[in-house]
């Protein structure tokens, strides 16, 4: 990821790639998943180049962001620090998984700063504990065992099976550059020095109806079954939400199928044709 700014926050310097374009629209702010980093958005950043302002960042513990001291921190406060440092009063948030959770929490805390939300298989603060099917539970147990034994390469491979391929799909369903990039991004996260305790935002699950619009929801039909179901529950609760269930992809459509994902962003009016 090309770094344009290092944004200092308590205990860290956040790596930011901001590419401004004077088109009068709120910048796109792309928030990565918890098994990736800002490079998840390579395709979207390329599509926005020269057409719309766009920003991506590596959160603490990911990518090129520098950890100076393990410090309790809040993701919402870190994002706010980035937007304030770059004098961005209002933005269009696009968040995947944990990045979707951050987008939701930020929008509820700072609704006046948000022009719209695009949530890609989002985690949600305060959501009910999921019930995992046997296949997902077996993978989760194997990941826990690999972590306990310090077998980080095995853990990385298993997490690719869970999040990139889809738990019900064969290992290696996604290969080539997408697989290599997943393993590189998640490998950094698995080996990152401790960033300090994460201070959770207030529960968002009971307040989804209060999200500022417009809200768009995207998910891959090959994702973990309980996450697909959660997306459908979210869709039923948010007034006026627009939905894009994507066939043939799992949890990370921007990585697995960037052209198809960018087509969704164009249909949503976030990218120009």
What function would you assign to each model-found segment?
Residues 102-106:
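Hydrolases whose catalytic domains are alpha/beta-hydrolase-1, hotdog thioesterase
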Residues 108-109, 115-147:
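Flexible "cap/lid" loop of the alpha/beta hydrolase fold
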Residues 1-13:
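N-terminal cap/lid segment of alpha/beta-hydrolase-fold proteins
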Residues 43-46, 55-98, 263-266:
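Active-site loop/oxyanion-hole signature of alpha/beta-hydrolase fold enzymes
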Residues 246-258, 262:
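Catalytic histidine-centered segment of alpha/beta-hydrolase-like enzymes
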Residues 149-202, 207:
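Conserved alpha/beta-hydrolase catalytic His-Asp/Glu region
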Residues 183-236, 245:
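Conserved serine/cysteine hydrolase catalytic core
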Residues 12-67:
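Conserved HGGG/HGGXW glycine-rich cap/lid loop of the alpha/beta-hydrolase fold
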